[in-house]
């Protein structure tokens, strides 16, 4: 018996008040639907079917890299109707697991428990007990605790509304059972929809065993219906990430002001992360790294004993051990800091390598530049890499000293141990071991007077 997963992602999401389909909104930097697909893949199914509706072509275009089978639900006629669109693609002997594209934090542990505890010919649902179950379907049990049916909130009687045990919608049974039950559903309810939950009563009626597995916590089965629910779930997720990192030896100064946006975030012990730090995409931080407040790191690797000072923005960079960056530095894609390099305040780098022990301490732009070892780049230095049509490279060799307020008009090379005088504008190579100055000689104009203002 193989496993087929059906993810229902056809909800209209009107309460999101957004032109973006609900399932494309991110949680922890990853679209809601992608999170559910990633969890489903951990169960090793042979196929993942996604039933989409609202904004379907846009959803498929944005998430076309996901290894799923896309199925359109052309009319929003309910969850039962949505599963009916996918079930013909499942083999009769398949075990089918039904998930939801807007329930992003369901855990593999809970799903494995559901699959393991549901009889091969039975039906299993994930249930949860909530302090406020308003709006959710209630689990109806008999006097012996057996599940009899699921009643949607809008269709529930007054005594049923007092029940706090709810249906999460997550369900498993065989494809053969679903092919038998789904055509029997009707839409005689307040919403005039075909409810998937009505299959529970059909299962009970024919003596099929029905069981419930409790969710580990309420948040893992929390659906996203509006922006506020998404915001609350985001903070819960970030607290989980902060706790996980803290227990692994990372100091998070304030878990409420920490954001991890991506799945591939690896942080070694003894790293310290200050407030309002955002880690996005693939981020690796080695031992004893210190990240100051208000720092953004995206797709970046940072070596041990390096300090990133406040208000620095770093994307797609490699920073090796014992470096210092910032405050107020910007490292754009392709930037590499070799061991012991230093980038100070208001320095911007793009596709530039700063060699071992080299420094660019302040007020500098380095674009398309290769800098050797032990180079000093003075304040106000600019590598002029763009001629209006093409980008050109600057090379600064080992031991060079670049004075303040220097413009290096690429392409050119500054030789080994060369010194460039402050205020120079170079458009040709500077030879090694020499002082190169390219500026007008200072002069004083005798007898000059400032003009006087007219009355």
Curated annotation (Swiss-Prot):
Keyword field: Acyltransferase, Cell shape, Cell wall biogenesis/degradation, Cytoplasm, Magnesium, Metal-binding, Multifunctional enzyme, Nucleotidyltransferase, Peptidoglycan synthesis, Repeat, Transferase
Cellular component GO terms held in the UniProt record: cytoplasm; membrane
Catalytic residues of the enzyme: 362 (proton acceptor)
Protein task: Catalyzes the last two sequential reactions in the de novo biosynthetic pathway for UDP-N-acetylglucosamine (UDP-GlcNAc). The C-terminal domain catalyzes the transfer of acetyl group from acetyl coenzyme A to glucosamine-1-phosphate (GlcN-1-P) to produce N-acetylglucosamine-1-phosphate (GlcNAc-1-P), which is converted into UDP-GlcNAc by the transfer of uridine 5-monophosphate (from uridine 5-triphosphate), a reaction catalyzed by the N-terminal domain.
Organism: Coxiella burnetii (strain RSA 493 / Nine Mile phase I)
Lineage: Bacteria, Pseudomonadati, Pseudomonadota, Gammaproteobacteria, Legionellales
Keyword match Repeat: yes
Cofactor note: Binds 1 Mg(2+) ion per subunit.
Name of the gene: glmU
A single GO BP: regulation of cell shape
Region Pyrophosphorylase, residue ranges: 1-227
Residues annotated to bind UDP-N-acetyl-alpha-D-glucosamine: 8-11, 22, 73, 78-79, 100-102, 137, 152, 167, 225, 332, 350, 365, 376
Pathway: Nucleotide-sugar biosynthesis; UDP-N-acetyl-alpha-D-glucosamine biosynthesis; N-acetyl-alpha-D-glucosamine 1-phosphate from alpha-D-glucosamine 6-phosphate (route II): step 2/2; Nucleotide-sugar biosynthesis; UDP-N-acetyl-alpha-D-glucosamine biosynthesis; UDP-N-acetyl-alpha-D-glucosamine from N-acetyl-alpha-D-glucosamine 1-phosphate: step 1/1; Bacterial outer membrane biogenesis; LPS lipid A biosynthesis
Name of this chain's protein: Bifunctional protein GlmU
Superkingdom of the organism of origin: Bacteria
Record's subunit section: Homotrimer.
